[in-house]
């Protein structure tokens, strides 16, 4: 029994990789239950399965309904906001709203929504700006917190957030890789900051991590993406290794697929960089997440 308890605030459990499917081809057997088992063993108590568009949000909810530890989000990722305009925008928003409103208890956040100016090839800036702001209607009506995404778009993100902050009960900016100043501005809006492997790549990232009060931090894996690579500045602080194979084998992690069990490695980096006791920090991160996303517990 692990002495730690975690809530993975961002996990893409609907990704076909956890079913053994890569680029549409079945490469190995479905091992989702093994993946969950490894995570539970190291102390993951709740999994927040992210919704990236309407269909993905439906799939995330459907999966969340199969396990008492699973919860989900409902929203549209900035790179997929073009879907609003491919359909009837008001109807698309209404369907997202109905999905969240009718499944409270399993749906714990609105998102993933925000801005991503690193990947404008998937969705132009104006479309992202318009439909990020539009999704505050979901948060306002459901009274659910937001699961937020901000990539290379801090000024515009902050502008929209300030204008609409009173329309949402709170939220977390996940997979944070911004500056100390950006983090401080988000904390001034009483938002939380989520860290995963993508947040721990450089020494500058680690300095940002040190600057954030522990009562404003959350932890995530964003698996199967955002694993900690050996080239990442944070990797030197990892103490826990998992049996890993380059080619899939039952009972082992797979080399290039991040898993929720790796959340222990994120904690090890965070606690070492911040010079904090790992157990104390884990408890703080857990309590922060309960406060925002599971207030009824």
UniProtKB/Swiss-Prot annotation:
Major location category of this protein: nucleus
UniProt-recorded Gene Ontology molecular function terms: 3'-5'-DNA exonuclease activity; metal ion binding
Cellular compartments annotated: Nucleus
Residues engaged in binding a divalent metal cation 1: 112, 222
Gene Ontology CC annotation, any one: mitochondrion
Entry keyword annotation includes Nuclease: yes
N6-succinyllysine modification, residue list: 27, 46
Residue numbers binding a divalent metal cation 2: 112, 149, 174
Keywords noted in UniProt: Hydrolase, Metal-binding, Nuclease, Nucleus
Cofactor: a divalent metal cation
Gene3D superfamilies documented for this protein: Metal-dependent hydrolases
Functional summary from the UniProt entry: Deoxyribonuclease which catalyzes (in vitro) the decatenation of kinetoplast DNA, which are circular DNA catenated to each other, producing linear DNA molecules. Plays an important role in chromosomal segregation and cell cycle progression during eye development probably via its DNA decatenation activity.
Descriptive protein name: Deoxyribonuclease TATDN1
Taxonomic source organism: Homo sapiens (Human)
């Amino acid at each position: 029994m692990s002495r730690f308890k975690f809530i993975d605030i961002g996990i893409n459990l609907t990704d076909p990789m956890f079913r053994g499917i890569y680029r549409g081809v079945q490469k190995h057997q479905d091992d989702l239950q093994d993946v969950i088992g490894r995570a539970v063993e190291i102390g993951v108590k709740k999994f927040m399965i992210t919704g990236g568009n309407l269909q993905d949000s439906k799939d995330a909810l459907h999966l969340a309904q199969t396990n008492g530890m699973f919860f989900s989000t409902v929203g549209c990722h900035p790179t997929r906001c073009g879907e609003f305009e491919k359909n009837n925008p008001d109807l698309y928003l209404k369907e997202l709203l109905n999905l969240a409103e009718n499944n409270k208890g399993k749906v714990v956040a609105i998102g993933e929504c925000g801005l991503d100016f690193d990947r404008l090839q998937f969705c132009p800036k104006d479309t992202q700006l318009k439909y990020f702001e539009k999704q505050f209607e979901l948060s306002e009506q459901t009274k659910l917190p937001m699961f937020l995404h901000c990539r290379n778009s801090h000024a515009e993100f902050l502008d929209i957030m300030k204008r609409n902050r009173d329309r949402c009960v709170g939220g977390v900016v996940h997979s944070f890789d911004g500056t100390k100043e950006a983090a401080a501005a988000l904390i001034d809006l009483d938002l939380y900051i989520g860290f995963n492997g993508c947040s721990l790549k450089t020494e500058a990232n680690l300095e940002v991590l040190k600057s954030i009060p522990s009562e404003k931090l959350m932890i995530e894996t964003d698996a199967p993406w955002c694993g900690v690579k050996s080239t990442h500045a944070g990797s030197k602080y990892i103490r826990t290794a998992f049996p890993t194979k380059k080619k899939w084998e039952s009972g082992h992690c797979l080399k290039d697929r991040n898993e929720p069990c790796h959340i222990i490695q994120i904690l090890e980096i965070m606690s070492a960089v911040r010079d904090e006791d790992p157990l104390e920090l884990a408890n703080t991160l857990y309590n922060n997440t309960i406060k925002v996303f599971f207030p009824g517990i």
